[in-house]
């Protein structure tokens, strides 16, 4: 093992990798932070709504929805991690300690790994449900919990490894350009792992598609339901294309630049696009909520109920304030909405 540089500054490693460390806010930095903060806030709000919907509706207390809830939790964590990054980027990067830098990177790696791993778990669970011809899988809750725990153990493992061993503090020639404190091999392994997850998802959803198509074709041979057969097939194709297309659009650019940097491509200008591709990967945490949750009719109804309930409470508070003011300090306040009808708790 060569000399270790545990007492050096962040600037030392950035200079070693050839990555510019800005001393002031450039227009590019401002644009990235503005977009990043916007995406992070949307990710937080959207996934909080998904978690609230799953927790409040007993119909969602099924294994597949537990996995959707875990996906929302992972994406919520990703929003927090990216928000932390936005407050510690640009000129503020130079002021980070080595521990602070590894914390910033570890939060991102852990949350994004958990999100990707949960996508694969959902695909496997859907495959199991379809093959068992069940609307909702009867997978025991204990096994679902073990699956979720496994996802987070793997995510924490990949997220914590760089800070403890998989770094380049003792081998400067192995440092990556995109993440100057990380080993290039770590980036390559992370990119290849994400690519493997995508290929497994393609295989699983392709098998689901052909299985369902064969079953519907058999039904169509015995029952006059050709329009329904066509509708079911097109709906399934649409779902598969949306799921895989969203993953490709959001993750492929980032995976490519990570792999190129991990393989040591000196002629590849990965630093010019890394921030935007990372933002695109973070946007996947917003897309997941739309693809996996908002396409569910019952989930949409629960969203409307939660949002309307919040609006109704706000309207009630305003009505109470107006009524109490009009009565000039009377001790009895009448709680009526603007239409004059009694309020009904929409959660019942």
UniProtKB/Swiss-Prot annotation:
Span of the annotated motif PDZ-binding: 345-348
Lipid-carrying residues in chain (S-palmitoyl cysteine): 308
GO BP, sorted A to Z: adenylate cyclase-activating G protein-coupled receptor signaling pathway; G protein-coupled receptor signaling pathway; positive regulation of cytosolic calcium ion concentration; positive regulation of MAPK cascade; positive regulation of Rho protein signal transduction; regulation of metabolic process
Residues exposed to the Extracellular side: 1-30, 88-100, 165-185, 261-276
InterPro entries per the UniProt record, alphabetical: GPCR_Rhodpsn, GPCR_Rhodpsn_7TM, LPA_rcpt, LPA_rcpt_EDG4
Gene Ontology, cellular component aspect: cell surface; cytoplasm; glutamatergic synapse; plasma membrane; presynaptic active zone membrane
One family name in Pfam for this protein: 7tm_1
GO molecular function: G protein-coupled receptor activity; lipid binding; lysophosphatidic acid receptor activity; PDZ domain binding
Cytoplasmic side: 52-66, 124-143, 207-239, 295-348
Tissue and organ distribution: Expressed most abundantly in testes and peripheral blood leukocytes with less expression in pancreas, spleen, thymus and prostate. Little or no expression in heart, brain, placenta, lung, liver, skeletal muscle, kidney, ovary, small intestine, or colon.
Annotated PROSITE patterns: G_PROTEIN_RECEP_F1_1, G_PROTEIN_RECEP_F1_2
Keywords on record: Cell membrane, G-protein coupled receptor, Glycoprotein, Lipoprotein, Membrane, Palmitate, Receptor, Transducer, Transmembrane, Transmembrane helix
Membrane-spanning parts: 31-51, 67-87, 101-123, 144-164, 186-206, 240-260, 277-294
Membrane topology, record value: Multi-pass membrane protein
Free-text function comment from the UniProt entry: Receptor for lysophosphatidic acid (LPA), a mediator of diverse cellular activities. Seems to be coupled to the G(i)/G(o), G(12)/G(13), and G(q) families of heteromeric G proteins. Plays a key role in phospholipase C-beta (PLC-beta) signaling pathway. Stimulates phospholipase C (PLC) activity in a manner that is independent of RALA activation.
Subunit: Interacts with SLC9A3R2/NHERF2, MAGI3 and PLCB3. Interacts with RALA and GRK2.
Record family assignment: Belongs to the G-protein coupled receptor 1 family.
Protein name: Lysophosphatidic acid receptor 2
């Amino acid at each position: 093992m060569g000399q270790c540089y545990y007492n050096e500054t962040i600037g030392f490693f950035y200079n070693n990798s050839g990555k510019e460390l800005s001393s002031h806010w450039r227009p590019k930095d401002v644009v990235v932070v503005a977009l990043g903060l916007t995406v992070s806030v949307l990710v937080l709000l959207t996934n909080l709504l998904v978690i609230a919907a799953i927790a409040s509706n007993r119909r969602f207390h099924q294994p597949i929805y537990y996995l959707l809830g875990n996906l929302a939790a992972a994406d919520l964590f990703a929003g927090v991690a990216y928000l932390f990054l936005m407050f510690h980027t640009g000129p503020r990067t130079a002021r980070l300690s080595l521990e602070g830098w590894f914390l910033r990177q570890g939060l991102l790696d852990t949350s994004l790994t958990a999100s990707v791993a949960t996508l694969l778990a959902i695909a496997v669970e859907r495959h199991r449900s379809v093959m068992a011809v069940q609307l909702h899988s009867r997978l025991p809750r204990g096994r679902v919990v073990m699956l979720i725990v496994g996802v987070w153990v793997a995510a924490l493992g990949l997220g914590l490894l760089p800070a403890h061993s998989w770094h380049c503090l003792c081998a400067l020639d192995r440092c990556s350009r995109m993440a100057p404190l990380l080993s290039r091999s770590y980036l390559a392994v992370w990119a290849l792992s994400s690519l493997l997850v995508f290929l497994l998802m393609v295989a699983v959803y392709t098998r689901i598609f052909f299985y369902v198509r064969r079953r519907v074709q058999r039904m169509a041979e015995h029952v006059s339901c050709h329009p329904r057969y066509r509708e079911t097939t097109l709906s399934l194709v649409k779902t598969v294309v949306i799921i895989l297309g969203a993953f490709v659009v959001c993750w492929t650019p980032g995976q490519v630049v990570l792999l190129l940097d991990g393989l040591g491509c000196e002629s590849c200008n990965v630093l010019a696009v890394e921030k935007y591709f990372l933002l695109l990967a973070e946007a996947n945490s917003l897309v997941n909520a739309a693809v996996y949750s908002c396409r569910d009719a019952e989930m949409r109804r629960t969203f409307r109920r939660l949002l309307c309930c919040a609006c109704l409470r706000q309207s009630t508070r305003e009505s109470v304030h107006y009524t109490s003011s009009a009565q000039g300090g009377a001790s009895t306040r009448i709680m009526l909405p603007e239409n004059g009808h009694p309020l009904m708790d929409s959660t019942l």
